Amino acid sequence: MNGPNANGNVIAGSGGVLLGEGRTNHEGRKALLLVRGDEDTSEYENLVSTMGIHIVEKMIQPGKVNPGSYFGGGRLKLIQETLSIKSGAYKQVSLILLHTNATPRQLVAIDQILGIEVWDRVRLLLALFTSHASSVEARTQVRIAKLLADRTILREAVSVQTTGERAGYGGEGATALQVIISSLNRELTTLRKRLGKHTHSAALRREQRRKQGLNTVGLVGYTNAGKSSLFRALSGKKVLVEDKLFSTLEPTLGQMEKSPRILIADTIGFIDNIPNTALASFKSTFAEALESEIVLHLIDASDSLDEIQRKFMTTKNELNERLTEASFDQTFKTMVVFTKIDRISAKHIAMVRQWIDDEQLHDVHFISSISHQGIDELRHSIFQNLFGSLQSIIVHLSSEGQGQKAVHALYSNGYIVHKREHGEQMFLDIWISESELAKLFHQFPHTIEHK
């Protein structure tokens, strides 16, 4: 090992505590991808591509994973020799990617041999989160997750250097790392207090919305399932919509179009095989979608059936995990929504429908946020689940000047599907909660009535 700074190569997200906040833009970097066995790396490579990183070569080593260094020590030394020549495709390689959630022991061992920056799956995701975090809360959440990941590495590095000291290598490196760990712990304390204030404020806002009679529909699903596109289709609100993994990192709230009493909450997507510790600081982000009356579980219908099954189970398990550890007592109705049906054939839809029958799923919808196919039906189902049946109301417009006030109140508290005027009466079909309608009957006793 080349001294304590060498461990900066395995700190989460390009530098972490040793090099300050580290870089956030990794566009154009060159990397080697190390893989054991015949694992499917397509999703991992998509994550890398989202970062703008170019994989120069995918190196595969058959056999069992080395518990101490992931790849065998001999193979790592050959890679180190190849990189040290700095010629051809390897000339600008500045990053080693591991297709695994590596242990601290493995990461430090690889750093000792290769001496350049090393990311496993968790560190790749944290670097991606860092590049997409724009709000103070999101940056705080990501920083906490990074520091927690960093601390495990630093503790392992201290252990390695302390062992080296006993063998006669000296203890200055271990002492320097212990100082950094102390600094890291102090920063974690500060950040957790800051995040606690954000979390408390967000919880108060949600409670206030509930007291005002607002309903929330949360969007959840695997990353890139089409949540942001559906959010825009339902709310009419312009949001970033990209065909990239984790383009949404922080919660976005919007009012359902033409329905002021319903909010849509879009939040971070789920992904397979990520430790709970990496998501622990995002509890308040998930809460925006989970503290809802309805949760829409989105699935990309254009995926293969195997991928649909895998992503469905990942999201389902993550939802259960988040609810188990959550501090709120919230029950919600779940609706399954298959997205991007404009991209698939009738044959594929038939196969998906058979899968739905096999899984015994209920209240399932097929939509396209691009062509808007199925959006009206989904909206109708949301209203039905929230409000029960469509209400038919008569407004007496000549009722001592209260008619127009009553109409305005109905528009403000519900969703008007159809209206018709006849003489001094207005006939409305409206989606509205029983409690809100009761308030309006009380407020306008001689002006509005059931048809």
Regions found by a protein language model. Give the residues of each.
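Conserved C-terminal guanine-recognition region of P-loop GTPase G domains, centered on the G4
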Residues: 20, 41-49, 81-90, 101-117, ...
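N-terminal accessory targeting/assembly segments
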Residues: 1-127, 448-451
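C-terminal-of-GTPase-core extension/linker across diverse P-loop GTPases
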Residues: 2-32, 151-225, 231-232, 320-451
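Conserved nucleotide-binding/hydrolysis micro-motifs of P-loop NTPases
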Residues: 38-39, 63-64, 101-104, 123-127, ...
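Switch I (effector-binding) loop of TRAFAC-class P-loop GTPase G-domains
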Residues: 209-215, 232-263, 271-287
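Flexible beta-alpha connector loops of hexameric P-loop NTPases
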Residues: 65-68, 132, 238, 268-278, ...
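Conserved beta-strand segments of the P-loop GTPase G domain that flank and frequently precede/overlap
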Residues: 33-36, 58-62, 97-99, 297-300, ...
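Short alpha-helix plus adjacent loop in nuclease-associated cores
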Residues: 124-142
